[in-house]
Amino acid sequence: MNAIWIAVAAVSLLGLAFGAILGYASRRFAVEDDPVVEKIDEILPQSQCGQCGYPGCRPYAEAISCNGEKINRCAPGGEAVMLKIAELLNVEAQPLDGEAQELTPARMVAVIDENNCIGCTKCIQACPVDAIVGATRAMHTVMSDLCTGCNLCVDPCPTHCISLQPVAETPDSWKWDLNTIPVRIIPVEHHA
């Protein structure tokens, strides 16, 4: 019994010593990240979709900060994210990436053909924003409000029952071209 207590005390002291050494080393040899990269990464939507041409949001933030990459390549974040990054970096706002607009003129969402879905959950595992719900061997469905249209769920599907379709336009999602709407200013007289 005495040998067990000696072993426990020895392992505890070793753990304490190694913990102290690692704690000191982590502070002494810490590498500071670029605070601008951190702020840009916080602004990005963290969908890790790769539509910007980078494998995730962090590499894209590093490319913006260090390599001068365009700030308009985040399709899921859209114009709101681009404007926040432009404000942070004190640069002029840019129109959204022309290539992305040509490829996807409308907002796209994944749609599952539920009659052919076998419930394998591969699409759920591939979705970076958890927009697909369902259980194993049960029908899956996409929550269109959360779907970013990143296309990452389409390829893993073994039955090819997932497709991207444009979102139906509603008065809320319609892009009003205010330059083509005739506007006439009518002077109003104030009566005292």
UniProtKB/Swiss-Prot annotation:
Amino acids binding [4Fe-4S] cluster 3: 127, 147, 150, 153
Cofactors, names only: [4Fe-4S] cluster
Enzyme Commission numbers on file: 7.-.-.-
Record-annotated 4Fe-4S ferredoxin-type domain positions: 108-137, 138-167
InterPro entries for the chain: 4Fe-4S_dom, 4Fe4S_Fe-S-bd, 4Fe4S_Fe_S_CS, 4Fe4S_Ferredoxin_RnfB, Elect_transpt_cplx_RnfB/RsxB, RnfB/RsxB_Proteobac
Residues holding [4Fe-4S] cluster 1: 49, 52, 57, 74
Positions of region (Hydrophobic): 1-26
Alphabetized UniProt keyword annotations: 4Fe-4S, Cell inner membrane, Cell membrane, Electron transport, Iron, Iron-sulfur, Membrane, Metal-binding, Repeat, Translocase, Transport
Stored Pfam families: Fer4_21, FeS
One of the record's GO molecular function terms: 4 iron, 4 sulfur cluster binding
One cellular-component annotation, GO: plasma membrane
Major localisation: membrane
Residue ranges of every copy of the 4Fe-4S domain listed in the record: 32-91
One example of a Gene Ontology biological process annotation: electron transport chain
Annotated positions binding [4Fe-4S] cluster 2: 117, 120, 123, 157
Cofactor, free-text remark: Binds 3 [4Fe-4S] clusters.
PANTHER family: ION-TRANSLOCATING OXIDOREDUCTASE COMPLEX SUBUNIT B
Family: Belongs to the 4Fe4S bacterial-type ferredoxin family. RnfB subfamily.
Name this protein carries in UniProt: Ion-translocating oxidoreductase complex subunit B
Gene behind this protein: rsxB
